[in-house]
């Protein structure tokens, strides 16, 4: 039952999926944290895998960069393959001076400069919010592990290289915690098709201060976030 962008067979994906942007990061997650792993799709080298974590079937697949790519894959995964829980795992740039590099942010809501959710909501503003049950599961997992998480609004940008850096001042004033490029689109797709979605990201760099994590720090923080998210996933 291949779609234009996924060549997996029916039933290849678990109901719960971790959804990083980078397909090689998806491969890393599958090979590092899952057992009984099988690669199930590779169209355009957007790799997808299914395996088990502590006995529960879990999938992981890349989404690509930006809302359009993420929305295509999310739509086909939910609509055509029956994926019910999509958890974006990735990195972001911090905006608020209260947020530090290596912090973990849970995107309770996703602001955006994209028009994609207005297009699907008849021209009106749609509140792109995470699913409460998924969010609560990850928060509880963080508590068990002693991991501090920040919960609040993030911003899903259409442009990586913004021509208007003054927008960051507005974001900070409005309490936006960090900037990434996918969550608002993912949340919109999930609401449209009756699925559940969440975005969990680590802060890899601080847009205001210029501070950045080293490659080693990024990997350690990312690994901790993945374990925290997988522990939440097995409770769903």
Curated annotation (Swiss-Prot):
Keywords: Glycosyltransferase, Transferase. InterPro entries: DeoD-type, Nucleoside_phosphorylase_CS, Nucleoside_phosphorylase_d, Nucleoside_phosphorylase_sf. It comes from the Bacteria. One of its GO terms (molecular function) is purine-nucleoside phosphorylase activity. Homohexamer; trimer of homodimers. CDD domains: PNP_EcPNPI-like (cd09006). This is Purine nucleoside phosphorylase DeoD-type. Belongs to the PNP/UDP phosphorylase family. It catalyses: a purine D-ribonucleoside + phosphate = a purine nucleobase + alpha-D-ribose 1-phosphate; a purine 2'-deoxy-D-ribonucleoside + phosphate = a purine nucleobase + 2-deoxy-alpha-D-ribose 1-phosphate. A purine D-ribonucleoside binds at residues 5, 180-182, 204-205. Its EC number is 2.4.2.1. HAMAP family: Pur_nucleosid_phosp (MF_01627). Catalyzes the reversible phosphorolytic breakdown of the N-glycosidic bond in the beta-(deoxy)ribonucleoside molecules, with the formation of the corresponding free purine bases and pentose-1-phosphate. GO terms for cellular component: cytosol. The record marks 218 as: Important for catalytic activity. The gene is deoD. Phosphate binds at residues 21, 25, 44, 88-91.
